[in-house]
Each structure stands twice: as C-alpha cells, then as structure tokens.
C-alpha cells in the first residue's frame, strides 16, 4: 500500500530574508493571486502570518493603482 507524502510548506519570504513586500513587484504578487483574482490563503501557500498581511496589503495597493486586475478576464 503506497503512502501519499505531502510536501512540506515553507515561507518563501522567510527563506529569502525579505524585509518588506513591495506592491510594484508584480511577478511575486501574481504568484499569490488565483486565476479568478482572489488572494490565495496562507494555509495553502505556507506563508507566515506577518508576510501574509503584507502580501494582502501589497496586492490591494497594486489593484487600486491598476497594476493588477481585481478579477479574471471574464473569458476573453
């Protein structure tokens, strides 16, 4: 009987020793936004609470400044 081993989650920001998450770093932010435009929760990504709060604020700022979309492209 084969056992399924779940990969260990780790905080990417802690591993890379990031001090603050920048709202202008769109490549990083896009990795934490789902296909539908929702912010992916930390229980799925493994991000620590401190960085999850910074991430949410940065994504919301980028959305407000029209750097990121609020939703998906609606089937375009």
Curated annotation (Swiss-Prot):
Q: What name is this protein filed under?
A: Small ribosomal subunit protein bS18
Description of how the protein assembles with itself and partners: Part of the 30S ribosomal subunit. Forms a tight heterodimer with protein bS6.
UniProt cross-references to PANTHER family, sorted A to Z: 30S RIBOSOMAL PROTEIN S18, SMALL RIBOSOMAL SUBUNIT PROTEIN BS18M
- Example GO biological process term? translation
Q: Which organism is it from?
A: Pseudomonas putida (strain ATCC 47054 / DSM 6125 / CFBP 8728 / NCIMB 11950 / KT2440)
**GO function term, MF aspect, one:** small ribosomal subunit rRNA binding
Which PROSITE patterns does the entry mention?
RIBOSOMAL_S18
Instruction: Tell me yes or no: is Mitochondrion among this UniProt entry's keywords.
Output: no
Q: Give the protein's function.
A: Binds as a heterodimer with protein bS6 to the central domain of the 16S rRNA, where it helps stabilize the platform of the 30S subunit.
